[in-house]
């Protein structure tokens, strides 16, 4: 087999996770090649919200000044079940603000950081096959046009469906809760509103309470990102027509937000969540971000996990036996939180759970403050307050009784 190009590190996927990994690897002096099927800038279905944890990662990448030119969000405005509450971003370990940037802009900006750091880009190219040596190390990739690309190490960041990950043995376990979502964009005079708005009482046109939420995330550019998402499992699939649902949700909020017309650029996504995949690493390769199901089961957020796992993967490139080290690192860092979050998210798929607990929770500001913190991945191992201790302890107990723990 002849090799047409090669790199020390090949990264497949130039979204936030892949570009972050490429940037950190290039900063360490490695020869990095990034391959992506798209040409940039390109859109991606997403809520576009950036939690304080994501903001912190962007600052580490050197994008703090760039982010300062975008909207700042104080926290979450949550409404439903007869109540509404505004909760500032909590937690001592992260910045006190979030933001929102359309993925069309965000992904290309992070990609340019990697490129400016020295990573080479091969865009508009699709990796379709992997080749191993006798010790099962990946030695090269085949692209759709027949080009062979050699590599010493491989980082796979090709998204929720992860076609290359599947070729490497990745398996998604759909009995664990997953998400379905749709989003679009609408113009409004309230695009500078400093709150990310979530409607927790999401109903279908016939009045049934759905296991999910609707959102309106101001972008500060004259538009908002509007969308709806729901939770599902193989046993209790969310039988939703997403595009009619976002249209219905838009009509419900039309007067309040001054919307005219229907959302543009409507796009949907399927989201493996909470580490509900196995086969995330081999001897010299790793899956990161959405490809490793690093998505929050309680809100569908994945950008902060993508940025973090990209950085962590780059830090492990000198290690041997990634097949053991990478799943262990993911489980240690995210396993407890993902386990208990999956369990809570599963409860939301039971029809009577939300109508029973929603009104009680919405009446308690203290409970909503706790909910925002844990739902937004703002608890760290260094936090010593009682909420952090209870969350970590609950996650540890939950993981002990998991039939299939995260990343296994």
Curated annotation (Swiss-Prot):
Positions with a binding annotation for FAD: 13-17, 46-49, 103, 127, 290, 302-303
Official protein name in the record: Menaquinone reductase
Lineage of source species: Bacteria, Bacillati, Actinomycetota, Actinomycetes, Mycobacteriales
Family named by the database record: Belongs to the geranylgeranyl reductase family.
Catalytic function, reaction form: menaquinone-9 + AH2 = beta-dihydromenaquinone-9 + A
EC supergroup of this enzyme: oxidoreductase
GO cellular component: peptidoglycan-based cell wall
Cofactor(s) annotated in UniProt: FAD
């Amino acid at each position: 087999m002849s090799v047409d190009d090669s790199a020390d590190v090949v990264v497949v996927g130039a979204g936030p996770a892949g570009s972050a990994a490429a940037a950190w690897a290039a900063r360490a002096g490695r020869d990095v090649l990034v391959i992506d099927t798209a040409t940039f800038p390109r859109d991606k279905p997403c809520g576009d919200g950036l939690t304080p944890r994501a903001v912190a990662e962007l600052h580490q990448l050197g994008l703090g000044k760039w982010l300062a030119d975008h909207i700042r969000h104080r926290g979450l405005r949550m409404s439903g079940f007869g109540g509404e509450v505004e909760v500032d971003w909590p937690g001592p370990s992260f910045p006190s603000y979030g933001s929102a940037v359309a993925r069309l802009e965000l992904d290309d900006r992070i990609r340019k950081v990697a490129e400016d750091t020295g990573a080479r880009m091969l865009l508009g190219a699709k990796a379709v096959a992997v080749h191993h040596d006798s010790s099962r190390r990946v030695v090269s990739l085949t692209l759709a046009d027949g080009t062979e690309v050699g590599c010493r190490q491989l980082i796979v960041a090709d998204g929720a469906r992860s076609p290359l990950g599947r070729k490497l043995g990745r398996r998604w376990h759909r009995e664990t809760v997953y998400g379905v979502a749709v989003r679009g964009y609408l113009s409004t005079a309230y695009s500078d509103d400093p709150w990310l708005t979530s409607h927790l009482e999401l109903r279908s046109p016939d009045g049934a309470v759905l296991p999910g939420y609707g959102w309106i995330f101001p972008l500060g550019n004259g538009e908002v990102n509007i969308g709806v998402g729901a939770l599902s499992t193989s046993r209790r699939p969310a039988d939703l027509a997403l595009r009619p649902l976002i249209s219905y949700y838009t009509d419900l909020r039309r007067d309040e937000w001054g919307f005219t017309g229907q959302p543009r650029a409507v796009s949907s996504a399927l989201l493996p969540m909470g580490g509900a995949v196995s086969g995330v690493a081999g001897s010299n390769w790793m899956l990161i971000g959405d490809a490793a199901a690093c998505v929050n089961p309680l809100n569908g957020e994945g950008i902060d996990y993508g940025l973090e796992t990209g950085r962590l993967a780059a830090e492990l490139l000198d290690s041997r036996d990634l097949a053991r080290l990478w799943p262990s690192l993911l489980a240690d860092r995210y396993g407890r939180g993902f386990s208990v979050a999956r369990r809570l998210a599963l409860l939301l798929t039971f029809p009577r759970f939300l109508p029973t607990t929603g009104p009680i929770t919405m009446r308690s500001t203290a409970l909503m403050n706790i909910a925002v913190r844990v739902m937004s991945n703002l608890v760290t191992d260094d936090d010593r307050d009682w909420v952090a201790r209870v969350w970590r302890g609950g996650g540890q107990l939950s993981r002990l009784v998991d039939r299939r723990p995260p990343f296994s």
